[in-house]
């Protein structure tokens, strides 16, 4: 209603829900405006009744409405999904999606947030972007970040992509998922060329959220997650393991006729399953170590609060995120007032501010920080060389410890131990008495950017300058270093019932004794090689103009980076990059990119290099002959594109490769009497190679983007082929004679070819009853082949690495079983433990035909441990407040090596790996394991090589979102309640 010059109205979305914070401004005069309140209402004073208002909101189509003469009028804004997708983040800038001719895929923070219960961005990316391959090797709290490759592996030195957060090289772990606006993955040469020596393995651009003009919007999210081990080996219990041991001993009687004495009587074996009393239960243990060590589930929590909004002068986004990851290991009472085990807590804070200093000047400030607090048993940190061993001791119960060797803890409080084999550990004791240590990682990142519109010089010209400073500080070894475990350790001999106590021996007195309890409280120390600092500054010019149907853009950038770890000499990089694009009528596209890069990792002669790329595109759907299909909404968009270029990589493992290096050799003297004429001497530890330079990769890419039937079907097809040259081969991997005297020089001698394709299909359908169903499906195939790696020239072809994939598995090839002693005698003999072979062993192929099975007969088998094919399918629906989706992820063409050996070290650990061979003609799954005898390592054949293919139900969710009624009365725009699960089911071979 218009009373004099006052206008009242309400802003709604297409579902009839009110919109909070919508912008309402007078057309032609942005100084007259307001925003809608919590109920979507607004009041605005306008000059006259003929005024026109522009109503807008992020992610929706803006509306122009004329002021009505009476009554409260309503403005309905519709979702603008095309608007949300029309801008793609590219290297050092943004481009309209329609004009992108490079291989770039993008997802949003909203998509990543579907993976509730996952706090790591890398893990959340799994399956959501074609071409991105993730491999997670650890579930330790705080160590869940997966290894990421883009389009597979192309170098044995380094295949990690460059990760940039808001334009600066930073780990993705420094950002919480709720703060992510978008993630772009740059895959081909045209997309990555502006990064020069840093872009050979692809680039991941993480863009964080920023504020928009309007009322403050507060978002609160919280979830609790229960985690259980996904898959553990199936071990036989004591009864079945001892029965299996008797079978194995009988099988070996021809080698050891006196081994009858090792066979357990059935009456004794029965006691392991059905002990008569506590004494028998302790003498004849039957321990399910997995049940002892692990909780039924571990709890993890994640909570986030963020607020965004702003005025014409300042726009803001601020976020606080908390993560807690619980421990699967159970808690044991150790009587020492501390609990060992694992855990991780992290707090992330972020504030992004945009100041509109003048109409043409914007000053941006990003300040972020994180504090990660990781708890482990003492020395079980990934920064310590003993970590792998210590962690293995704690997991040994789940994998290796026999169920009958001892109890974790006896009724008198003594810990179980095994005196006959020193490396048999009590995992429960290790978890309980492992001490406790905290590793605190503090990260602070700051960005200051000034953006200036220079249209007063020439239309479309702008400049940007930025400086950033990051600091990472790590403190570890704060906690309890448990030096001596509990004094009471015992073992009960099941054959005699005799109790043995663990004792130590004093060399000075000759007495043995039981150690007492002792530990140190450690105050912590700075981890020098994990403390990092990074200084980066950039200056950039951009120009964008349209001349009729001719659209031109230019970008030029200078960047310098200084990084240092601990007290080392800083690393330096310098980049001069440019990009130029041209398109005619948004139909024909040309792009050329380049970068002149410098790195101090190489000699002055090789310190700088120029890398460039070009791309072309054709928007077929904009051609006049496609008008018939477009008008009938059969074809929405069809674009064909191609790119080619050369990119570099300076991410070599070692510095100073171009210099001769010397190391301390020792002291000596010039006389018989070492006190006279002493001197110190040094040795040449590494021979330098002044010609060491960048690894280079030439990338060729063809792509098709399509959309049909008004967006019902959309997607893309990519075909790529890369050739990487000048790959560094380390001195220890080179073929040189032993009399050279030291390692050979590291040199650029390697070549690898990578090829593959990507398929993506998106389905989106909204029905008349407002039900929406959608599906995103993708597949990536990426394979590589080593062309050269300085193999010894006289090696047989199958013994070389050239001709096979990086990481190609090799095995001794088996061809069925030895079914009789005639087979044993008539088969190729082994050069070690040949006399120990028996019927039931594998028939190992003499691959090189020299009559003997030895180390030279190991041949390529299966694939590498990086999958060639990855698949993703996400299906969902939305109707009114209800929503649900499921996501499946799968891989194939991958080989895993999992060596679980039954009866290892004569322990009664037996794995359920299928049926054993027992006589000729059996359809056996594996050979009959040994208990006493030893076979050569060749005899395992391919037993421990598995097809690593799997299909996983990676994510599933059912939810309901409240948007009106009681929710609005609480001042809440919407409230979502959901049940979500991750890695719920897996099928594997």
Q: What positions do the PLM features span?
A:
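C-terminal beta-signal and terminal closure region of outer-membrane beta-barrel proteins
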Residues: 746-754, 796-827, 913-927, 934-940, ...
């Amino acid at each position: 209603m218009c009373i004099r010059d006052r206008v009242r109205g309400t802003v709604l979305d297409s579902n009839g829900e009110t919109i909070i914070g919508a912008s309402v401004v007078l057309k032609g005069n942005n100084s007259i405006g307001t925003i809608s309140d919590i109920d979507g209402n607004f009041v605005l004073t306008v000059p006259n009744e003929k005024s026109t208002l522009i109503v807008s909101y992020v992610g929706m189509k803006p509306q122009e409405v004329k002021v009505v003469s009476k009554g409260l009028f309503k403005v309905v804004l519709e979702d603008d999904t095309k608007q949300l997708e029309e801008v793609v983040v590219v290297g050092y800038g943004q481009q309209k999606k329609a004009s992108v001719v490079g291989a770039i895929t993008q997802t949003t923070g909203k998509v990543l947030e579907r993976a509730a219960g996952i706090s790591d961005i890398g893990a959340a990316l799994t399956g959501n972007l074609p071409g991105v391959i993730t491999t997670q090797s650890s579930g330790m709290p705080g160590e869940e970040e997966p290894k990421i490759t883009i389009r597979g592996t192309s170098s044995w030195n380094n295949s990690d992509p460059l990760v940039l957060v808001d334009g600066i090289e930073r780990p993705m772990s420094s950002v919480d998922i709720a703060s992510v606006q978008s993630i772009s993955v740059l895959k081909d040469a045209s997309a990555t060329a502006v990064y020069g020596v840093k872009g050979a393995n692809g680039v991941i651009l993480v863009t964080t959220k920023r504020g928009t003009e309007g009322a403050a919007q507060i978002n609160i999210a919280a979830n609790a997650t229960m985690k259980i081990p996904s898959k553990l080996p199936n071990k036989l219990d004591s009864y079945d393991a001892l029965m299996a041991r008797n079978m194995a001993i009988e099988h070996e009687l021809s080698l050891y006729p006196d081994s009858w004495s090792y066979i357990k009587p059935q009456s004794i074996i029965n006691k392991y399953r059905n002990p008569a009393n506590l004494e028998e239960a302790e003498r004849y243990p039957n321990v399910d170590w997995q049940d002892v060590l692990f909780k039924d589930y571990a709890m993890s929590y994640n909570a986030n609060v963020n607020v965004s909004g702003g005025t014409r002068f300042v726009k803001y986004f601020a976020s606080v995120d908390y993560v807690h990851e619980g421990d699967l290991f159970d808690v044991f009472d150790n009587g020492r007032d501390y609990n060992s085990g694992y855990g991780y807590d992290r707090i992330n804070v972020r504030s992004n501010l945009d100041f509109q200093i003048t109409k043409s000047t914007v000053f941006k400030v990003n300040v972020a920080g994180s504090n990660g607090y990781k708890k482990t048993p003492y020395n079980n940190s990934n920064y310590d060389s003993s970590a792998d061993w210590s962690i293995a001791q704690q997991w040994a119960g789940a994998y290796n410890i026999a169920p009958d060797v001892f109890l974790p803890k006896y009724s008198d409080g003594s810990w179980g131990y095994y005196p006959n084999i020193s490396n048999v550990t009590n995992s429960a004791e290790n978890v309980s008495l492992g001490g406790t240590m905290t590793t605190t990682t503090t990260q602070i990142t700051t960005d200051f950017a000034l953006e200036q519109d220079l249209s007063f010089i020439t239309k479309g010209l702008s400049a940007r300058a930025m400086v950033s400073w990051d600091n990472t500080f790590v403190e570890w070894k704060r906690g309890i270093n448990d030096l001596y475990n509990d004094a009471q350790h015992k073992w009960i001999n099941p054959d005699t019932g005799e109790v043995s106590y663990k004792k130590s021996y004093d060399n000075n007195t000759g007495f043995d004794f039981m150690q007492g309890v002792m530990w140190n409280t450690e105050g912590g120390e700075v981890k020098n090689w994990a403390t990092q600092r990074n200084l980066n500054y950039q200056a950039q010019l951009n120009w964008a103009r349209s001349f009729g149907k001719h659209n031109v853009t230019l970008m030029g950038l200078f960047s310098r980076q200084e990084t240092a770890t601990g007290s080392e000499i800083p690393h330096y990089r310098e980049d001069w990059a440019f990009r130029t694009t041209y398109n005619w009528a948004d139909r024909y596209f040309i792009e050329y990119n380049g970068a002149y890069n410098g790195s101090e990792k190489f000699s002055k002669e090789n310190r700088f290099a120029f890398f460039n790329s070009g791309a072309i595109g054709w928007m077929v759907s904009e051609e006049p002959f496609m008008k018939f299909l477009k008008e009938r909404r059969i074809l929405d968009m069809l674009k064909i594109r191609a790119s080619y270029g050369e990119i570099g990589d300076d991410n070599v493992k070692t510095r100073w490769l171009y210099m001769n290096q010397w190391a301390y050799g020792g002291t000596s003297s010039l006389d018989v009497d070492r006190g006279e004429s002493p001197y110190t001497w040094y040795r040449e530890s590494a021979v330098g190679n002044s010609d060491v330079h960048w690894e280079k990769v030439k990338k060729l890419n063809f792509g098709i983007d399509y959309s049909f039937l008004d967006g019902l079907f959309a997607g893309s097809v990519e075909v790529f082929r890369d050739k990487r040259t000048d790959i560094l081969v380390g001195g220890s991997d080179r073929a040189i004679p032993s009399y050279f005297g030291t390692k050979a020089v590291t040199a650029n001698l390697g070549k690898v070819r990578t090829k593959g394709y990507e398929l993506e299909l998106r389905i989106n359908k909204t029905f008349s009853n407002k039900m929406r169903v959608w599906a995103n499906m993708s597949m990536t195939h990426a394979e590589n082949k080593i062309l050269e790696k300085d193999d010894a020239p006289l090696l047989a072809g199958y013994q070389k690495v050239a001709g096979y994939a990086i990481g190609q598995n090799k095995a001794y090839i088996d061809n069925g079983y030895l079914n009789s002693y005639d087979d044993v005698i008539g088969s190729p003999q082994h050069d070690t433990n040949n006399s120990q072979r028996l019927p039931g062993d594998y028939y190992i192929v003499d691959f090189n035909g020299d009559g003997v099975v030895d180390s030279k007969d190991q041949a390529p088998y299966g694939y590498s441990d990086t999958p060639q094919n990855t698949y993703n399918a996400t299906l969902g629906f939305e109707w009114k407040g209800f929503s649900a989706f499921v996501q499946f992820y799968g891989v194939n063409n991958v080989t895993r090596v999992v060596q679980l050996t039954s009866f290892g070290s004569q322990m009664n650990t037996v794995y359920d790996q299928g049926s054993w061979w027992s006589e000729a003609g059996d359809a056996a799954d594996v050979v009959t394991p040994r208990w006493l005898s030893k076979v050569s390592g060749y005899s395992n054949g391919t037993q421990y090589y598995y097809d690593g293919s799997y299909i996983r139900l990676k994510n599933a969710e059912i939810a309901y979102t409240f948007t009106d009624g009681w929710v609005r009365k609480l001042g809440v725009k919407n409230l979502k309640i959901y049940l979500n699960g991750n890695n719920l089911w897996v099928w594997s071979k």
